A protein has these predicted regions:
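Metal-ion/cofactor- or nucleotide/acyl-coenzyme-handling active-site neighborhoods
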Residues: 2-404
């Protein structure tokens, strides 16, 4: 029995060593410039050698010259995060303050100048569209979800069946299928927007997307703008913001006042009713209430299989999390129907670029004082680092400072 016990202990120790080595190996991969995770990622145009990058002294050099010149350090090729931050991202520790590498990258871009890289955008858009089929599958429609179709939930195993009720609630076709907007503004709700003066820049876009029924009121006009073409909502927002269930008359009055005060009377409302079981009937009630009471808003239901494809696409690119936030998900979708994507108010940290405290929401929502970092369904820190990579590569514009 003694030998058996010793043998068992030896096996356990061996397993622990192997697991630890495996963890160290994965972390080394994450920090290596040869892997597209949280370290340096090659440009989509690296094969052509035609992209200009910024050298350490600010001059522009061809990417092939940079690759062949070990003495040239490309500012845009700096790692987005360092090894210690990679370990946090890989584990359960949240990155709650902007790492120095992020701050340096953002400062370099601001100091040296930045433009959209249209060639890189086209390549990336093609890859993303081929993997996710956004134009066909982003919105649940009567074309892609006929009666009796069996469709999988996006955030859990299992499927649901398209009933007559669901079919009647679907749009015949997606209003975004054949549209390409020159510029889109995606506006998060970070306290970073307070005092930013970004309202005019946001409103310049051809298509403006906002999240979770924000307060788009005159008080915030200079910082967040006034226009909204699509706004997301979830079940919690629908109930808590208006203090009643959607079918109640007080809710109808409160919602009508809200959309009028926020200039949302004709805005498309985007919902995700089929992420998990149990939400479908609630959102159908919501949609039917709007229709019965004469609201002009069209409700667009997300196709859950599209969201799952988007999650799988980013997982292959190193972004693993239980569920992407609606913000990151909509950025991914917008890359298919917007030529240029500009992102405002996305900031997962407790301090800004100059170390000042930042509220989670510009409206000082005291229900979310932690910056959302304790929501274990999302890893908004991981998402932000991926957005920073896209910004560095000229694929999206990530606005993290004032616009004045």
């Amino acid at each position: 029995m003694g030998r058996q016990a010793a043998s068992a202990v030896s096996v356990c120790l061996l397993v622990c060593v192997v697991v630890s080595l495996g963890q160290m190996w994965r972390i080394s991969l994450l920090s290596s410039v040869r892997f597209h995770r949280w370290g340096v990622t090659s440009s989509p145009l690296s094969a052509t050698g035609s992209q200009l990058v910024l050298s350490e002294n600010g001059s522009r050099v061809k990417l092939d010259d940079f690759n062949n010149n070990s003495n040239t350090k490309a500012v845009y090729g700096n790692p987005v995060v360092n090894n210690s931050d990679i370990i946090k991202l890989y584990g359960n520790t949240r990155v709650v303050r902007p790492p120095p590498t992020i701050l340096q990258l953002l400062d370099n871009i601001q100091r040296l100048g930045w433009t959209f890289n249209d060639s890189a955008i086209e390549i990336f858009r093609s890859q993303l569209e081929n993997a996710t089929r956004t134009r066909e599958q982003f919105i649940l429609t009567q074309q892609n979800a006929p009666v009796n179709a069996s469709i999988g939930f996006s955030a859990q195993n299992g499927k649901f069946t398209i009933t007559e009720r669901i079919f009647d609630a679907e749009q015949e076709t997606s209003p975004l299928t054949d549209r390409t907007f020159a510029t889109c503004s995606l506006v998060g709700n970070s306290g970073l927007l307070a005092g930013s003066g970004c309202g005019r820049e946001i409103d310049k876009a051809d298509f403006v997307i906002r999240f979770n029924m924000p307060s788009v009121i005159p008080h915030w006009r200079d910082d967040i703008g006034t226009r909204t073409h699509l706004v997301t909502t979830n079940a919690h927002t629908i109930v808590s913001k208006f203090h009643h269930q959607p079918h109640n008359l007080p809710w109808v009055h409160a919602f009508r006042n809200f959309v009028r005060n926020c200039n949302l009377q004709t805005t498309h409302i985007f919902t995700l009713p089929f992420n998990v079981r149990g939400n479908g009937d609630f959102f159908l009630d919501f949609q039917e209430t709007l229709k019965t009471n004469g609201f002009e808003n069209k409700v667009l239901m997300n196709h859950p299989e599209h969201r799952r494809r988007v999650s799988e696409f980013w997982a292959r690119d190193g972004l693993n999390e239980p569920t992407p936030t609606s913000g990151f998900y909509l950025v991914s979708a917008a890359l298919s129907f917007c030529k240029h994507v500009r992102v405002f108010g996305f900031w997962p940290f407790l301090t800004d670029r100059r170390g000042r405290a930042v509220e989670y929401h510009y409206t000082l929502n005291y229900l979310h004082r932690d910056g959302g970092l304790t929501n274990w369904n999302h890893r908004i820190d991981r998402e932000f680092f991926k957005l920073a990579e896209l910004y560095r590569d000229g694929i999206i514009e990530l606005v993290t400072d004032s616009c004045g």
